């Protein structure tokens, strides 16, 4: 089957609706929608939930942009894309909870197609989800990775290990020499064996996010926390900001293509702190995080 961008777009719009409804039901607060247009072509729907019962900020963004020429960030590694028009669409979300015992979560699914007359289209899917805890709980990590493995299983025994490793490699702060969190799944440039197979997998990842995350939220939301835990959460959120602004390809692509800055930076935590050369107290729960986020096989 030839690539069907319209079909993908309809799924992504439904996915945004489903995730927002699910998160709102858990939190009790509603998302505010901001529809926007891109002068160079396309637009999107940005939805943000602020200061809810559980989530300090949750952003779920749909975007569909198109243009006559590829940006430098895309053609640098793929010269075959030069001179092609393109469409890029996706749903991207980040959830920052109030409670430091609830991890931050991120998910993204996307589709890209570039075309020119007289040539076959160049297309691929990408996406994944990853978890960033502030205090580590093994049962949460096992559940997160088991959900990821189970959704990958129908697509082959090698899919979960491959995309888990890719996630571990991608969400790594080189300047800190540390992982951003405990990973999950990350895939990109997926275009084999055919469109239907790849689209099915992207849908499985998108639909699997809430199954992976919400049981963890339910387990941790009633845990009591105070100023110490909050300060550590804000400090660790700094790593999130550093990764997104320095290393994340999606952020750089969005800014280089003239994307909507407010939507691109919606992933940023609402509050964050840096402290020069801060070190956790030896033997403390905060000190245990550095070991907890080391790459390992959770299941």
From Swiss-Prot:
Source organism, top-level taxon: Bacteria
Q: Where does substrate bind?
A: 92, 108-110, 258-260
| Pathway(s) the chain acts in | Porphyrin-containing compound metabolism; protoporphyrin-IX biosynthesis; protoporphyrinogen-IX from coproporphyrinogen-III (O2 route): step 1/1
The region annotated as signal peptide is none
| Compartments in which it is found | Cytoplasm
Task: Please give an example of a GO cellular component term from this record.
Answer: cytoplasm
- Positions binding a divalent metal cation in this chain are 96, 106, 145, 175
- Catalysed conversion reaction: coproporphyrinogen III + O2 + 2 H(+) = protoporphyrinogen IX + 2 CO2 + 2 H2O
Cofactor(s) recorded in Swiss-Prot or TrEMBL: a divalent metal cation
MF-aspect GO terms: coproporphyrinogen oxidase activity; metal ion binding; protein homodimerization activity
- Oxidoreductase in keyword set: yes
Q: Which residues form the active site?
A: 106
Any Gene Ontology biological process: protoporphyrinogen IX biosynthetic process
Which key words tag this protein in UniProt?
Cytoplasm, Heme biosynthesis, Metal-binding, Oxidoreductase, Porphyrin biosynthesis
Role noted for this protein: Involved in the heme biosynthesis. Catalyzes the aerobic oxidative decarboxylation of propionate groups of rings A and B of coproporphyrinogen-III to yield the vinyl groups in protoporphyrinogen-IX.
Binding partners and assembly:
Homodimer.
Q: Which HAMAP family match?
A: Coprogen_oxidas
Family indicated by similarity: Belongs to the aerobic coproporphyrinogen-III oxidase family.
What the entry lists under PANTHER family is as follows: COPROPORPHYRINOGEN III OXIDASE, MITOCHONDRIAL, OXYGEN-DEPENDENT COPROPORPHYRINOGEN-III OXIDASE, MITOCHONDRIAL
For this entry, the protein name equals Oxygen-dependent coproporphyrinogen-III oxidase
**Which species expresses this protein natively?**
Salmonella paratyphi B (strain ATCC BAA-1250 / SPB7)
The opening ranks of the lineage are: Bacteria, Pseudomonadati, Pseudomonadota, Gammaproteobacteria, Enterobacterales
């Amino acid at each position: 089957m030839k690539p069907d961008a319209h079909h993908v777009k309809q799924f992504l719009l439904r996915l945004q609706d489903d995730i927002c409804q699910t998160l709102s039901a858990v939190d009790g607060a509603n998302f505010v929608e901001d529809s926007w247009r891109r002068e160079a072509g396309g637009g999107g729907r940005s939805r943000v939930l602020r200061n809810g019962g559980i989530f300090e900020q949750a952003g779920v963004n749909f975007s569909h942009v198109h243009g006559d020429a590829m940006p430098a960030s895309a053609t640098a590694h793929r010269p075959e894309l030069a001179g092609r028009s393109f469409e890029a669409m996706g749903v991207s979300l980040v959830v920052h909870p109030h409670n430091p015992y609830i991890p931050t979560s991120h998910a993204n699914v996307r589709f890209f197609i570039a075309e020119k007359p007289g040539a076959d289209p160049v297309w691929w899917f990408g996406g994944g989800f990853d978890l960033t805890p502030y205090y580590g709980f093994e049962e949460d990590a096992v559940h997160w990775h088991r959900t990821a493995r189970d959704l990958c299983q129908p697509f082959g025994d090698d899919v979960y290990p491959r995309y888990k490793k890719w996630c571990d490699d991608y969400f790594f702060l080189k300047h800190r020499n540390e992982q951003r969190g405990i990973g999950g799944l990350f895939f990109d440039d997926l275009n084999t064996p055919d469109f239907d197979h790849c689209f099915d997998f992207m849908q499985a990842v998108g639909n699997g996010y809430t199954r992976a995350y919400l049981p963890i939220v339910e387990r941790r939301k009633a845990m009591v926390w105070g100023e110490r835990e909050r300060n550590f959460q804000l400090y660790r959120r700094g790593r999130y900001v550093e990764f997104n602004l320095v290393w994340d390809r999606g952020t750089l692509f969005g800014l280089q293509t003239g994307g909507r800055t407010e939507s691109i930076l919606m992933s940023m935590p609402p509050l964050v702190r840096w402290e020069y050369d801060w070190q956790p107290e030896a033997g403390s729960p905060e000190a245990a995080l550095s070991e907890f986020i080391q790459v390992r096989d959770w299941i």
